[in-house]
């Protein structure tokens, strides 16, 4: 069975807004590139999809080597966007307007590599339903003080207990925390 993995950068105070956080350095970028090697499908919400593309498609042709690799991989991967309003999508993307929990549970059963969840908007819903198997939080050494957070107040119905799998401290001071859902 495929695993569903959530991986995201966030500040010490839990801010996940891309505009509030610095870009990863080469070592952190390499970590995300390696993580993406075991993935063949990415799931986004509409807003994150519209932030990521066409940015990464363009970046794949203009950036340094690490960003080029990441952009090319991201653009080439199959993607699903969960949206009721998006009319069209590009870059190997299909739009799904049904329940994300049901769709991702179906996709987990299909043959293939892991599924990467690239949005926090669905995190409470997916986490509570037990869809997400692993969490990779890369903590940036800063307090953002504002912006969207990993989980907004009131969106998680009950606590989510996780089990630590691994940690990594990058030279930049960024810290990767790898968790899996705790077995009941």
Where are these regions (language model features)?
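Enzymes that bind and transform nitrogen-containing heteroaromatic metabolites
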Residues: 1-184
């Amino acid at each position: 069975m495929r695993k569903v993995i959530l991986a995201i950068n966030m500040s010490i105070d839990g801010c996940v807004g891309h505009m509030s956080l610095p870009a990863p350095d080469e070592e952190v970028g390499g970590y995300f590139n390696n993580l993406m090697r075991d993935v063949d499908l990415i799931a986004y919400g509409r807003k994150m999809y519209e932030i990521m593309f066409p940015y990464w498609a363009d970046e794949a042709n203009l950036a340094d080597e690490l960003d080029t690799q990441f952009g090319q991989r991201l653009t080439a991967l199959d993607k699903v966007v969960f949206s009721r309003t998006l009319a069209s999508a590009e870059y190997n993307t299909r739009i799904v307007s049904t329940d994300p929990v049901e769709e991702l549970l179906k996709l987990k059963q299909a043959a293939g590599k892991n599924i990467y969840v690239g949005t926090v908007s669905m995190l409470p819903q997916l986490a509570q339903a037990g869809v997400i198997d692993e969490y990779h939080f890369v903590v940036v050494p800063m307090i953002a003080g504002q912006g969207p957070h990993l989980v907004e107040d009131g969106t998680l119905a009950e606590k989510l207990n996780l089990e630590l799998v691994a940690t990594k401290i990058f030279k930049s001071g960024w810290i990767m925390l790898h968790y899996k859902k705790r077995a009941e």
